[in-house]
Amino acid sequence: MRLMKKGTLTLFLLLAISIPLCAQYVVQGVVTDSLTKEPLPYASVRLKDTTEGTTTGSDGRFYFKTHRSEAVLVISVIGYNDYVRTIRPAGNASYKVALAPTEYALGEVVVKPKREHYRKKDNPAVEFVRRMIESRDNYSPYEKDFWQRERYEKTTFALNNFDEEKQKKWLYRKFDFLTEYVDTSAVTGKPILTVSARELLATDYYRKSPRSEKQWVKGRKQAGVDEFLSKQGMQAAINEVFKDVDIYENNISLFTNKFVSPLSRIGTGFYKYYLMDTLQIAGEPCADLAFTPFNSESFGFNGHLYVTLDSTYFVKRAVFNFPKKINLNFVDYMLLEQEFKRAEDGTRLLDHESITVEFKLTEGQDGIFARRVADYSNYTFTPTAEADKAFTKPERIIEETEALSRPETFWAENRPQAAISQQENSVDRLMTQLHSYPVYYWTEKVLSILFTGYIPTSKEAPLFYIGPMNATISGNTLEGPRIRAGGMTTAWLNPHLFGKGYVAYGFKDERVKGLAELEYSFKKKKEYANEFPIHSLKLRYESDVNQYGQNYLYTSKDNVFLALKREKDDRIGYFRQAEMTYTNEFYSGFSFQLTARTRQDESSYLIPFLKKEGDTYTPVKDFSVSAAELKLRYAPNEKFFQTQWNRFPVSLDAPVFTLSHTIAGKGVLGSDYTYNHTEAGIQKRFWFSAFGYTDVILKAGKVWDKVPFPLLIMPNANLSYTIQPESYSLMNAMEFMNDEYFSWDVTYFLNGWLFNRVPLLKKLKWREIVSCRGLYGHLSDKNNPALSDGLFAFPIENTQTMGKTPYVEAGVGIENIFKVLRLDYIWRLTYRDSPGIDRSGLRISLHMTF
């Protein structure tokens, strides 16, 4: 879910694409209801006996191009009479088509424009689909032992509807040259200004046994307003939003969500199907199978499958749209088109794919036009030497060293003819002109700081980043107001050696804190030290405050947005720590980390160390532990979104297994205690097709030795009013002490499954959330200072040990409030009589997702 937010934010920074002008004649117009005069969205518009055509947009308008000087135009939509007329596109006329509502029969199925009585029983369309589903694997390319193909892909983003009126606005008047780069979308017919373009030339390889898929990238080209963002991070976000689509899967992944495929095993319970017409597609007679969800707010599609009228049920062409009322954010219009061809043995081969999207942040805006086009060619089923070489590589995507620096002659020679634009290098020229304007330069700087949190020290290839800026000012009870400044080097300074650090100062305790880190990467990096895969040796020294019982896993403890607390933040001491860490990550998803560490924990007036011997308590200023730690992690098929300071999984579909052990010996390198700590964890996202998904995190751990309380296991308390993963919203810091535990964090996102059925709520497009977090813990007698001498007394009066009852809190929530907010109401279900606790409360977070 964190990555959904990242991917969504960066998507709207990108802005969008133009499609080549390659046809001679334009066919355009609008389709309306003849009675109500309302526009008819998603009507099928095509030229008879051809594959040329489109679907009307949400405003009923259509636009496409053809080289034919004369053709028969056919417009059809469920519940209306078809429109058939001979046209002459050479005249470039605009057609206003009013369709008359009608009743029509499909076998036993009667459809009415106002109130439809749809039945699955004895419906020939449903039976037709069932036979398609039963035979969907018969000619699948994934049943072959091997195949390879050439891929050309172009993804572009553009300012949508960039007409003369918009060009006159004050913002664009400053850049009067923009009119030179305005193009016309061949899909929507709207004027667009392309501001970002990406191209890819690659070879795809597939092997059935052992299962493996590889992509060998020969060329990659990119230019646009998103240049200041991480190239790897942006590519990961775009790949997640515009995933390769397999219509034969049960679920189709798009926009970080999963949508029910019309050929899903549950399709007949999710979709209504109609046999519309018979037409010629590439010389073969095909049935036009239309489909639409029973519930238009659900995560499904409207569309058409053009299926051959033989026993193979071969899909020649697929056209998908989103229902107008779908509970999906920021996507105003989407058109997905796929074309297939047969191999000599009948295997279906994807020949062409395009997805066109109009994004809008709010209603009333023109938003962003985006289009991804992919052409596939040169299929072969005989293994090649190049394929054998690819399968020996550990990474799934193999990128040639010269891929990002290919000359324009390379692209001119390798682009498919249909992909050649009249303004192929327009984005490069546009960016050159924009960068010459100071107002654009400073706007880009501000956006870079807002979206990354860091300030680059130079315009291009910065050697150093200053930040993160959201950690500059914070505060707590021990330090009072706190200021912090820091930064890090990049691969442009040295691709193998990286430095990072910060200096902080508390005005109340008048102490300087800081971090100094030096990392040597055995792999040459492109931008940042933490790029996957990491193979490095790191030296790190840190001196700072220790907020006991608070460990924010996905943000900095100095984040200014965590400053507002529900209780006094006074469980704070000091620590100094020096460590050396060796990290090695593998493309298989396995990684390990070896760390040698020496740490000194220091008491404070808030957290005193009082060593108990009988009835005597002796103050101790500090203690030290020198330890070695081994961490193992396995996350197969994990993909990352890269940022300057961290990286996040693009999705949580991949399971993540972790195992760690820390060992220290008393007297070894100055260690005051023998210490052994083992921890294991697993997390996974489970999709339930149309019913949403569940994120599950399970962890367990144990401290094996007698140690003072700073070395025990303290559950992670969240004292802020924000929603934080893997933390407890109603638990106080240091409320419980354990030396062994088992915890769970389960959140079910229903994606509007219930609200979409409530007339009022479905208009709000809210989505439901149910969560439950809990921890079962135990503190053995040897680590309980009330029962055993030689330990530090618990410094907090209300600290307690757990009985046989686990700590549990549960919540219900609503996300997608104004498209950006999530509100949860949390109840504490156990240990409700403990003093000084909150039994329930409202929590909030920003949550931008599609």
Where do the language-model regions lie?
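Bacterial Sec-dependent N-terminal signal peptides
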Residues: 1-30, 45, 104-110, 529, ...
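Short, ordered, surface-exposed loop/turn motifs in non-cytosolic proteins
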Residues: 25-27, 34-49, 68
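A short, amphipathic beta-strand motif
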Residues: 27-33, 60, 97
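A short, solvent-exposed loop/turn motif at the edges and junctions
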Residues: 47-49, 74-85
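Short, acidic Ser/Thr/Gly-rich low-complexity loop/linker segments typical of extracellular
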Residues: 51-61
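Extracellular beta-sheet/turn segments enriched in Thr/Pro/Gly and aliphatic residues
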Residues: 88-114
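Structured extracytoplasmic
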Residues: 103-104, 110, 114-286, 292-300, ...
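Exposed, low-structure sequence patches enriched in small/polar residues
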Residues: 257-259, 391-850
